[in-house]
Each structure stands twice: as C-alpha cells, then as structure tokens.
C-alpha cells in the first residue's frame, strides 16, 4: 500500500472512530432528532414512503431523503433508534471529509489536504451536525460534493456530462429543498462568468443542470400532493418560500445579519481564537499585506476597488472557486430573516482550506503561538479531568448551581455526573483528555516544531470530542430527556393512544412509538393527557365542560420539548 492510500485510510479510520461509536449513547433531548426519527418509524410501520402521517394527522416538514436513509438503516438494524437516526448524518460527514480530502490532495498536495480535513473534523459546528439526526449534514455533504464535481467538470474542459454532480444535487433537493441545487449552480455559474466562459453558455449549462436535479423533487411533490392535498402544498410553500421571505405563520429562528458572523466565529472555535491571536504576532510587512501597502493608500477608493477586483478575478482558479463558494452562500443566507448556524455549513470545507493555508504558513514561520495553544489545551484537559474527579468525590456542592430558574436542572446534571456507574471502557474515555494533555506537554518539553504543536492541538480537540460524546453528554442529557415521561405513560397505559394538548411532544411521541394524538383534533372518551404547565389553564378552560380531569403526576424537571414542567391528567367523558 503506497503512502497516499495509507493516509486516506488513516483519515477514514480516524473519522469513523470520532463520529460513529457513540451515536446511540445519548438519548434524544430536543425536538429535532425525534421529529426526524418518528417519520422514519411511521414509514416502516405504515409502508407509506411518500408522505407518512405521524402524531395521527401530521405530515413531515421536509422532503423524504433523510427519512428514507434512516428507515433503510433501521430496517437493517431491526428498528428505529437513536443510533440509526443519527447514522446517516455521520456517514454523510465522513463521505464529505474523504471526498474533499481527495479533491484538495489532487490539486494542492497531501499535507494541505490532511490539515484541511483535520480542521473540518475538529470544527465544533461540523462535529455537532455530524452526530445529530438532522437534515443539515446530509444536505451539506451533497452540496459540497456537487460543487467539487462541477469544478472538476469545468477543469477538464466540460467534455463529459456531470451526471454524478446532478445526482448529488437531486439528492440534496430531496433532503431539504431547492438550495441543494441552487448553491452548486449559483457558485459554478458565477465562477464560469469570472473565468470568461460567456454568459449564455454559463447560464445554459447551469439551467440544464438545475432543471434535471429538481425533477426528482417535482415527482415527489406530485406524489405527495396526491396524498396530502392543499395542506401539503401550504406546508411546503411556508417551509421554503415563506421561510426565505420571512412570511411564516410562526417565528422561525429570526436573527439579525450579525448573527451569521457570530455563528461562524463560534462554529470554528478554537481555530478562530488562534487566528485572532496570530494577527498580533504578524510582522509589519505581513500586516501590510493584510491591509494595504503605501502605494495603495494614496489611491482613491474607486481605484482601490478596481485593483482589488482585478486581483480577485485573476487569482488561482481553485482559490477563486472556494472564495465564491464562501461569499455567495454566506451572502445568500444574510437575506432571509430566518438564520441558523447550520445553514452556513456548506461553506465550512472551503473555509477549512483557507484556515489550513494560513496556519501552515504560520507553522513554517515557526510561530510560538502553537506552543502556547498546546499549553492552554493541555491545561484544559487536565482541569476537565480534575473537575470530573472532584464531582465524583462529592467536592462540588449543589449550592454552586445557584437558585435561578435552571438551578434544579443543573443540580440534576451534577448528580448524574456524580452518581452514574461507569465501567472500565468508560473510565478509559474519561482519562482520554488527560492522556492528550500529557502528549501536548511532552511536545512542549521536547521543543517540538510548530507543525507538531498544530497537529497536537487538533488531536487534543478530538480527544475532547470523544470524551464529550462518549461520557459527558450522554450522562447529562439523560436527566433532561423526555423518555422518562414516555415510560411513566407506558406504565399507566401499555397500549392504545395517549394524548397531548397544545404543544408537540416529539420526544415523548418517539419513545411511545407514535402513540400520541392531539386531543383537540379527536374526541376520545377516556385516556391520559399531558400538557405543559404554561398551557394548563387554557386546557382546563377548553376541555373541562366535556371531560372530568384528574391530575396523575407532574414532572419535577423541565421537559426538553416544552421547556417547562409537564402535568399528566386522566380524563373521561362527563355523564
């Protein structure tokens, strides 16, 4: 096996070990993941792979490709679970990492490709999306691969029709909507214009690719319309055009423009900290290159912009393409009112390349900044381990959590970390950050090169991610998951429908096997009902004339769906 193949398989193995083993460790603790998982569950139960109903009357918010993937994996595994719901996202991320690694290695060399891949793998936002059972990572992988394939198609003289790129765009649109096709066509179209391919030729190619890639989506739309009718059409319009235009019937992640900048800074932690810190170490000549030289300062703004634009268009084709991918997608998501950090994930691979180029230059210069960061993250690994042992020994009092609204929940987290039983394998994971810290301190003691410290910090981040996914997150979220509510309801009524009022309890419904129904939409004669406390008075006012309501239990913690305490009632029709 040659060196290139060995490096490829090492990266593949590292990605698998970091992302896959702990997918099933954490219970669902938010609305999003069980909402996706229950759609796949109802697909398998009903046999309806186009537009299955869940919660009795509800249809899925998005196209079905992710649900198909979850259902296929779950069928092979024997049922839908936390692991099978999250597995497609991890496979998509690993595939994207390996494809982008090969794409960069072929054009810029193996060292830069390895560093780019490590930066992506250690990005907080990428990691979070890769281990979550949500739509975002699957669509992002298709978008990034389609972009790379379209660049390769243009690079090779546009001799062959890029069917694989079109297939990726089609899968992207079937995952989360038209942006799976819009982004690759938009970026590639602008790139071809700047490369002087001609407007009509560029527009014609992109229109053709875009049209072919949305055909499967239109076919699914038609088949789903036959089942869902106007309700389906209204939902799809609201989730796509309504979300972009800010005309949705409910508030959906509405944020100002500066939110996108903050999420990028946070999503690239700690590499953004390293980048900012490095700016203070630049020599005067290097700092001038980042701003403007003396001759540029004497020119007018029009001349400066014209010269900057000329340099921008004449840079290396791959650099230009990556810059266009970052800038166009970022600007696109600054337009709608709805903004989320995961929307910007398609630009992360291309940003990783720019970070890798910058950090490699710093390392070649022998910057001591990497050694300082080794000390910082080594200390962080030691402090995390010491804090955990202090909690296990009962040295951290409950009073440290204060008396605020979330104090009881935080105390529950503390008790879970203190009292949960861990076997030998878990203790190895607990000690992993400490091992990483010792390796970093050894690098410092040996006066290792800046490049060694750079890779050491990346390795330390991976140790922290593994410890977090394998130990800390599963232990903590077990206290806030609504699986406990579902289990109490199962104990009260092992079979048949159960009911909720007002809010959607996606987690409870998932753990009940899609047994929840909206009591407002049905007329049961008796049963059990759950309601968040903030809607309890409204529920009593609406239902008390029809039903006799008897309280059964109330949670002592906040539901992860309702973000409030929940009360269960037994109800029966008044005589």
Predicted regions and their residues:
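Membrane-integral, polyisoprenol-dependent glycosyltransferases
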Residues: 1-371, 552, 561-568
């Amino acid at each position: 096996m040659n060196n290139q193949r060995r490096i490829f398989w090492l990266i593949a193995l590292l990605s698998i070990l970091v992302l896959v083993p702990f997918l099933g460790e954490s219970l669902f603790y938010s609305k999003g993941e069980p909402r996706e998982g229950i759609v796949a569950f109802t697909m398998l139960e009903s046999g309806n792979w186009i537009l299955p109903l869940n919660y009795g009357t509800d249809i899925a918010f998005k196209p079905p490709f992710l649900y198909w993937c979850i259902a296929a994996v779950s069928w092979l595994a024997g049922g839908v679970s936390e692991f099978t719901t999250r597995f497609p996202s991890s496979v998509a991320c690993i595939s994207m990492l390996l494809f982008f690694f090969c794409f960069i290695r072929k054009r810029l060399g193996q060292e830069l490709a390895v560093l780019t891949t490590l930066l992506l793998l250690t990005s907080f936002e990428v990691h979070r999306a890769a281990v979550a059972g949500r739509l975002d990572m699957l669509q992002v992988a298709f978008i990034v691969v389609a972009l790379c394939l379209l660049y390769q198609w243009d690079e090779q003289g546009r001799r062959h029709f890029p069917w694989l790129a079109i297939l990726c765009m089609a899968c992207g649109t079937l995952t989360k909507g038209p942006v799976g096709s819009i982004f690759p066509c938009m970026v590639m179209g602008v790139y071809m214009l700047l490369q002087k391919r001609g407007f009509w030729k560029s527009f014609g190619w992109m229109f053709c690719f875009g049209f072919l890639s949305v055909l499967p989506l239109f076919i699914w739309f038609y088949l789903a319309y036959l089942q869902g009718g106007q309700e389906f059409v209204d939902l799809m319009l609201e989730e796509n055009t309504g979300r972009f235009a800010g005309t949705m019937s409910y508030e959906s992640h509405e944020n100002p423009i500066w939110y996108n900048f903050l999420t990028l800074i946070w999503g690239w932690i700690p590499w953004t900290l390293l980048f900012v810190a490095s700016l203070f170490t630049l020599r005067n000549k290097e700092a001038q290159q980042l701003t403007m030289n003396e001759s540029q300062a004497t020119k007018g703004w029009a001349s400066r912009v014209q010269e900057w634009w000329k340099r921008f268009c004449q840079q290396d084709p791959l650099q230009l393409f990556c810059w266009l991918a970052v800038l166009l997608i970022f600007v696109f998501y600054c337009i709608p009112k709805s903004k989320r950090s995961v929307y910007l994930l398609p630009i992360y691979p291309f940003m990783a390349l720019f970070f890798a180029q910058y950090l490699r230059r710093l390392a070649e210069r022998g910057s001591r900044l990497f050694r300082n960061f080794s000390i910082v993250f080594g200390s962080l690994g030691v402090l995390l381990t010491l804090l955990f042992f202090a909690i296990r020994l009962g040295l951290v009092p409950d009073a440290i959590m204060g008396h605020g609204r979330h104090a009881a929940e935080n105390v529950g987290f503390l008790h879970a970390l203190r009292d949960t039983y861990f076997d030998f394998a878990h203790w190895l994971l607990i000690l992993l950050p400490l091992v990483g810290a010792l390796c970093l301190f050894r690098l410092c003691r040996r006066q290792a090169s800046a490049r060694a410290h750079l890779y050491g910090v990346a390795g330390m981040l991976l140790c922290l991610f593994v410890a977090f996914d394998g130990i800390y997150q599963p232990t903590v979220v077990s206290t806030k998951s609504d699986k406990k509510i579902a289990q109490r309801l199962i104990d009260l009524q092992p079979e048949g429908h159960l009911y909720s009022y007002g809010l959607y309890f996606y987690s409870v419904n998932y753990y009940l096997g899609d047994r929840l129904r909206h009591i407002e939409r049905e007329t049961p004669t008796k049963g059990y009902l759950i309601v968040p406390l903030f809607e309890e008075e409204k529920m009593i006012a609406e239902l008390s004339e029809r039903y006799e309501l008897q309280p059964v239990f109330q949670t002592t913690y906040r539901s992860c769906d309702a973000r409030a305490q929940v009360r269960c009632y037994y109800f029966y029709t008044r005589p």
